[in-house]
Each structure stands twice: as structure tokens, then as C-alpha cells.
Amino acid sequence: MRILVGVLCAVTLAAAMPRQTLTAATSCDKLASLALPNVTITLARDVAPGAFMPTADPGADDPPPNPRAFAGLPAFCRVAATLKPSSDSDIKMELWMPAANWNGKYEAVGNGAFSGAIGLAAMAGPLARGYATSSTDTGHAGNTGRFALGHPEKLVDFGWRAVHEMTVTSKAIIAAYYEAGPRLSYWSGCSAGGRQALMEAQRFPADYDGIIAGSPGLDWTGRAAQAVRGAQLLKDESARLSPAKAQALHKAAVDACDATDGLKDGLIADPTKCKFEPGTLQCKGADDSSCLTAAQVETARALYSPLANPKTKRETAGLQPGSELGWTSLGWTASARATGLDQFRYLVFRDASWDIDRFNSQTDLARADEADEGIVNAMNANLKPFLDRGGRLIQYHGWSDPQISPGNSVQYYEQVNKLLTGVKVSDSYRLFMAPGMGHCRGGEGPNVFDPIAALEQWVEQKNAPEQIVASHMTNGAVDRTRPLCPYPQVATYNGTGSINEAANFSCKRP
């Protein structure tokens, strides 16, 4: 009981802690006896410097993380726990805490897709920077939606509860280990982790002081419907685009839209400012790899187009011109298609035999939205509680993302601004769109940048990010840098100097 009281006091007093590095106040193994509500600590062990070697998660579909991700880690206390906020919950989590030189801060990391594994590799970075860090499997093993069939509480865990419970538990264990809770807490995630980021800001505004929401799957049901619709349309092989035809379509899109920002640089600064018509590529004679058949033109139009919920009239965005190099033979990425199928099979119709052939584009997005009830979709635009308590949110998205439409990020940012009239949203929440960047990373445009450094400056030094410089690399060498700008600003060439150097661009409204 003494430890539990100490935990509560330390969390309460965390904000008053001086900004200095701290060393553990108790031994790691003693945390095994820590009593917390609905929590069973299954491991509390010291890890020597450079000694951690991951193994495959028993329930995960992914291979074990690359050991190189853990090279050079400092000594840390490794804690594993199982959380049971409901009778059907089985949430696994890990928390890593530096044995010495803790920076007094906590950074949790997000997941991907259906998230059935703890993100050990993602935890390595924060730990190396002096953070206490944690991750969760969101309450199930494996990266499919099968876990939700017949288990409504597990769906709630996946949708939002597991991350919040992990956060509360992590802060309590941190307080017990250092006799001081974290003075600042951060969240960082991309894709499903970006969805988790926005869900935390919406539901639990006090959990985190700063949040990174990368390429967020906030419109979970809409993305699922779009991906399934695309796969259904493309079951007709004559409508599919070969890699060569996708390349030709991509070139046509870039040729048509590249100069909308006044600069021909091989990147589309904002695809929404260009009305690209794939019909311009329709074959005028014999079919070959440089043109599209009439059926393939319709495929492209469908993949670019939004899909509407006929009951609420809301639209979920399609893919954007410039994303074609990431398309598969069935349109959206294989991951998007798999999670889309599982969404309808296990979460909407709750029928393991349901197949893509049964998808109805006129009615099934509405059914998916109704079944979700805000459990997984993170589209609540009321961020006022998070902003009012001083929270800071950086959201980013690649314009060439072939897995989660960047249009959904723009829609959400605009909805927040529309709802919070009288609030200068950009003082606390900024969206950065990355021309030519794919899903979370990669692509023809600059796609390597450090959003957490920008967030730390914003939260801790009150320096709002006016731009974030991103790099493009080829064979490990930087060959282009460009500022990412707070939406709706775009990087605008100053007129002189190399177009491959960020210093020659300014962020301006178009």
C-alpha cells in the first residue's frame, strides 16, 4: 500500500519537478509487487546497456524487429503488464524506463493496422533519447480483425480503451520507479497510431501534452469502404492497371498538376488544386502500356473519387493524383484492402463468410458508420478541451499516400476550424502536408523529418513550428530538402537558388 500511495502523490506533484535528469529511486524488480487497479505486472527486469534482443511476439503476424534498431540502448527497466479493464479484456503492454539520465518525460508510441503486437522497435528511439516509453498490443494478438467477432469489449479496447489504460498505468509505474511522475507526456504514432493519436486528443485531453498524428486512419470505416469498393471493381481483370500503366498514369497526373504551384519540380504541391482527368490518357488506337482502356479510365476515376454515406451525406476522400506508384493491381494497398475486408467481415456484418462480392457501395458505408458508433472512427472535431488545457498537436500526411487518403486529414483539420469558431486553432494544432510522400514515409518527395523535435520545441519552448524541413534521400544521400508548411500554406520557391534546397523556399498561402 505504501508504494501505491507514493505513486498517486508522485503523479500529482509531477508538474512541480525541476527539469533535470533523474535516476531510479527503487530497484526494477520491486515493481513486480506494485498494486494497481486491473493490472497484473508480469515482468520487471533490469536490462544491461546494449543487451536487449527482441523475439517475435507470439501472436503477431510480423517477424521480430530488426535487432539493429536496439543497438546501443542504455540500461533500462523493462516492465510488462496485462490490463483487464473489462472481464473480456486482455491488454498487453510494455514500459521501458532509463535506469539513469531519465529526462523526466514520457513518450508512448502507436501501432499499425489492427495493431496486434507491442511496438518494441518504435520504443527504442524514445528510450535512446532519455524518455520513458510504452506501447500496447491494444488487447489482442495478430494483425486481423477476427478478434472482434463476438467480443465487443475487445473492440472497445482496440478502438480507444487500451491506449488510455496503458497511459494511466505507465504514468503510475513511472512514478513508483523514480518517485516522480513525468513532467510532460507525448504521443507519437502514424497510420493506426495516428488514429490513436486523435482519439486520445478527443476522448482523453489530459493524457498527453503533445501529440504527433501521422497519416491518421481517423476515418476507419470510410477507408475500409473505399478499399473494398476498389477491390470489387477491379475483380474484372480488364479494368486493372499494370505497373507500367500505373506509371503512365502517374506521369500524366504529375505533368498535369506539377506547375499549379508555379514550379515544375516533379511534385504536386496540392493535388486538390488540380482537376486531373484520367480520360486524357485513354487509348486512341491499339491498347499498349502507355495508355488506358476505357475500363481502366473508369478504374482511375473511381479510385480518385470520394464515397458518400447516403444517410449523413458525409464523404470519405479517394486517392489523390500523384499516389499512383503505390497502387496495387487492386487499387489501394494490400494492407488497406485486408483491413477493409476485415472491417466489414468482423466489425460490421459480424459474419466470417462475408466477401467483397457482397459489398454495396450505395449502402454499406452507412452500415459501417452506424456499427462503429465512434468506437474506432476518430472524427470528433471538438478538440476544445485538449486545446484549452494547453495541448499541442502536429498532424502530418503525405499527399501521395496510397493507403489512407490525405484528403481525410484536410477534411478533419477544416472541420475542427469550422467547429471551433472564435478559437485560433493554429495556435495549438497544425497540419503539415508533404508533397510526394507516401504512407508515413517514402515517396518521390522529401519524406524524412523529425516531427517530435518540432513538437518538443512547441510544448517546451513555446516555439510554434512555422515549417518543418524534410529531406529526400537516394542511396543514403540527401538530394533534396524542402520545408513542409502549416496547411493551407505551401512551400513557395523564392525565385533564385537551387530548387533542391529548403532555404530557397518560403511558406505562403496559395
Predicted features, each with a name:
Residues M199-A201, A206-A308, M433:
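A catalytic-pocket lid/entrance helix-loop region that shapes and gates access to the active site
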